[in-house]
Curated annotation (Swiss-Prot):
The modification Phosphoserine is found at residues 13, 20, 191, 438, 450, 454, 485, 514, 549. Gene3D superfamilies: Phosphorylase Kinase, domain 1, Transferase(Phosphotransferase) domain 1. It comes from Rattus norvegicus (Rat). One of its GO terms (molecular function) is identical protein binding. The gene is Stk10. This is Serine/threonine-protein kinase 10. Residues 835-866, 902-947 have a biased composition (Basic and acidic residues).
Amino acid sequence: MAFANFRRILRLSTFEKRKSREYEHVRRDLDPNDVWEILGELGDGAFGKVYKAKNKETGALAAAKVIETKSEEELEDYIVEIEILATCDHPYIVKLLGAYYYDGKLWIMIEFCPGGAVDAIMLELDRGLTEPQIQVVCRQMLEALNFLHGKRIIHRDLKAGNVLMTLEGDIRLADFGVSAKNLKTLQKRDSFIGTPYWMAPEVVLCETMKDAPYDYKADIWSLGITLIEMAQIEPPHHELNPMRVLLKIAKSDPPTLLTPSKWSTEFRDFLKIALDKNPETRPSAAQLLQHPFVSTVTSNKALRELVAEAKAEVMEEIEDGKEDGSEKDAVSAVPPPVNHTQDSSANGTQPSLNSDKLLQDSSTPLPPSQPQEPVNGPCNQPSGDGSPQNTSPADEVSKNDNGLKVPVPLRKSRPLSVDARIQVTEEKQITDQAENPSSAASKPPKVNQSRPNSSALETLGVETLANGGLELPGSVTPNHSKRASDCSNLSTSESMDYGTSLSADLSLNKETGSLSLKGSKLHNKTLKRTRRFVVDGVEVSITTSKIISEDEKKDEEMRFLRRQELRELRLLQKEEHRNQTQLSTKHELQLEQMHRRFEQEINAKKKFYDVELENLERQQKQQVEKMEQDHSVRRREEAKRIRLEQDRDYARFQEQLKQMKKEVKRSIEKALRKQRQESMRMGQDSHTQKKQRLDRDFVAKQKEDLELAMKKLTAENRREICDKERDCLNKKQELLRDREAALWEMEEHQLQERHQLVKQQLKDQYFLQRHDLLRKHEKEREQMQRYNQRMMEQLKVRQQQEKARLPKIQRSDGKTRMAMYKKSLHINGAGSASEQREKVKQFSQQEEKRQKAERLQQQQKHENQMRDMVAQCESNMNELQQLQNEKCHLLVEHETQKLKALDESHNQSLKEWRDKLRPRKKALEEDLNQKKREQEMFFRLSEEAETRPTTPNRASKFFPYSSGDAS
């Protein structure tokens, strides 16, 4: 069910599926085998094999990284690396020679570095780098990082395995497979990716917390860890498993050098400021370039010597271990393992890693020409009784220059056995220039331990699983070269009394359960390696002696298993990063689609109301025009009707005037003739004047009546139009209110919908994180089970060896003790021969009882060891389960906090939106009321203009529509 949900989360719709893309720096139309010739295999990385290739035309060498990809999505995972390599042209960064995608395989051709990786060089030479060599590497790495960070690129996987060497003594920064190329200068990342031991604290936190992203300062932390790795061969906390080291990085103080006194103050100060847990105060690469530790570097001679030594011709000579006299040396050379256990527990080292793998170094007789001197200071200090006391290199780790013990953990690595017993002697012979101090100072003799593992570094150079040695902390500076060379030879000439040391040695081995050196020395061999090389005309010869045993194969196997474990974790990281990228892409697409849909919905709603308003205005205009037309028609008809009536009235009025004239005539005719003429004349004049006055008054009254009728008609039309305009404005404002209300409702709905989508996306993101975390936890449990199984098998094998070896030891010891007892009886001469035989018989019976007790003690010890181992394995699993549960609980708790914070943020946004909505509503109402007032003002002004007296020829106007209708 969970997997189905996981598939659902990452599923894209049909139109969202990506098609094949053409990339700028990847050729698809060319078979790389036609251009390059494969010469051999260089190594096997986490995502594919690396081959040495040669260009068929130019003869240029390249490292071909061949990766099988199943889909375009997988191909895109490597495009970032190709683009970074293609755009980074820097002398200390590997160059891209070409990239091909052909037949389902991606070929990345990069610059070939014959010197190999720095971690492989340390394995080959059985030692770390000297401080001058570290200075040059650090300087060149800082210049490369400054260039990368200037291009907004975060490497995210800095370590010695990703620093390649050229024969000219320059480095090449490689492996950009997990690098990030930002689009903005201040952009930060939240991907949990990289190799655990080198991760910065802010990167570790991103495993469960994505809200605390990191930037390019994470590379500065990895640089500091890499410098410690080059000084001590292994990174800090290498003895812990990857899950525990993540907690260690996040909760502990920044790591430091195990033996700070062996290194300069500049180096220690550089590490102190580079390994700052606060990324805000951590310096940048440009600032670190001004530090005194690297600012004085002007030559790469130290690295040229290093590469020359690593690539030098090696002559090996194997000598069988001697049985005679070696047992005595072994007794005095073996340190008490109890001290090791105490040192380990005091420093918090895992008991499961220390219970059966205590470091034991045995000494090798030195040539007579070399003086026998202590190793690293007070190695052979006289004990209280005057007898010499030898200290192994493992004990030297926990002592300072004054011989006092300091809390330094044993140099071991889970889950690798480090029982290898190594003694290294270096002899340098300078033939051309015998007084060349620089060459001698740069390669001081070392006392080495077996390197537990190679930290599983997938590099583009040669990955060598050499039987290298682990240098004790501190590649010496010139100030310490004399002390280091004086301590390079461990004296083995002193021996203890055989009779007293034999039983002590046996009891020590039986008590601790460790392998007896007397038995193991019979099978050990001494490997002598002589390297001869020339640097600047100076021939240098270095001879290294190392005791090899069957544990070498065990160490190599453990180293390989550790590489496999880290490779599995890195594959999980890569897949997790791919899933996170796909999910982020899907979420961005969902948000983009949602915003686009929101815009479309809002635009559609606005368009709907705009169309409604437009229709309303058009209808209003049409209605007003129709009303004006109707008004014009009514005016004409009314005017015509009134004129007709007035014409009839006028005709009647004329008739009345005629009657009046006739009456005047009749009244005049009754008068005398003489008077009649005078009266006729005066009556006609009076009648004419009266007629004119009456006619004028009648016409004026008719005109006034017509004007009053037209004004009344116009006023009625104006009132109708005003009512229509008011009604239209009210409808328009109601539409505007509905429009704004709909938009506000959509905005609120969109806020809710966006919140739900973001909330669901957050849940999907945490679901994916839980899914990836559970897969990682399952892989860690699987690795822990394999580790516990290996520990059980190793314990069983060791117990079987001890059980088989005990009878031989008892027989030899019994013969020796019997001979010594008989010799003591003979010397003392006590009693007769029969008494002596009786004493011998009693002594023999006591020896049988003692040997039987030893066998029972060994059996009990083996049972206790097995019980302790089972308990330890269960404790390891329980501790791992507890840590995983805490991490899951932390992830769930963080998810709850994020969801709560998201809800609170949404509620706050909704509250702010509602607070802003009130003034928006108020502004809308004010605007609508203002438009109403403006309309009423316009109506009033129009009415006043209509009532003002006008000239007879001037037509009254109310609206522009009626201007042509006044007639």
